[in-house]
Amino acid sequence: TGSERQEDEARCLELGASDFVPKPYNQRVVKARINSVIKLRESAAALSAIEYDDLTGLYTKSAFYYHAGILMRYKPDQSYVVVIADVKNFKLINNIYGIRVGDDILRYLAKIMSKALTDGLAARYSDDQFVMFTSIPKNDFEKYLENAVRYISENAPITNLLVKYGVYKDVDKSISISEICDRAIMAMKSIQLNYEKNIAYYDDQLGQQHIREVMMENDFENALRNEEFEVWFQPKYN
């Protein structure tokens, strides 16, 4: 009966079937539905290739931007934190230990980050950088991050693995996710040459310093373009 057929169709779809073709079969309809299912599967595979990094299984940078933006719009009252992790001297690690060990390090970091995040996002941001986006935990976040950094260092595939972290807490949701990440990167770069400090936090002072540096660079370029520099030679006497 019609009701039995509808029940069978509902049951098949609940069990995971992509489609249901009732009797009597129409050859053209069956072929068309099969082609539609194949195209959907191919589209899903293509989307997965774009969305996930092959090596680590984490989101790609573009997918991270998309999902983080949705998360902020979905929960606008939530406070969020972004953490950028940068593996120091990664090219040197590849040269010394080999690319396979370098890949193991990236997979190791990705695994740790995936386990640490229960309601957030993690992505491979670039070749040797990762990004995490999550709501700010109710417990002591600074202490939690310090313990996580210590654990990562102590259990790394190689000794003396150095990872620098830039943190932007309570992000400004009025700016784009790329700008949010830029602020975390700015914090990370502020300690790139400091071998006694592995974690840095973005603040307004750091932001103002960056603005001044950019303005100085722009002024310098304009001065060069306008030939405003003069070369003076100081005579040297014995």
Residue ranges and their predicted role:
Residues A32, Y66, Y108-K111, N147-R150, ...:
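Generic recognition of well-ordered alpha-helical segments
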Residues E51-Y52, G57-V81, K88-K115, A123-M132, ...:
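Conserved long alpha-helical elements within nucleotide-processing catalytic cores of c-di-GMP signaling
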Residues V82, R107-D172, S176:
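GGDEF/GGEEF active-site signature
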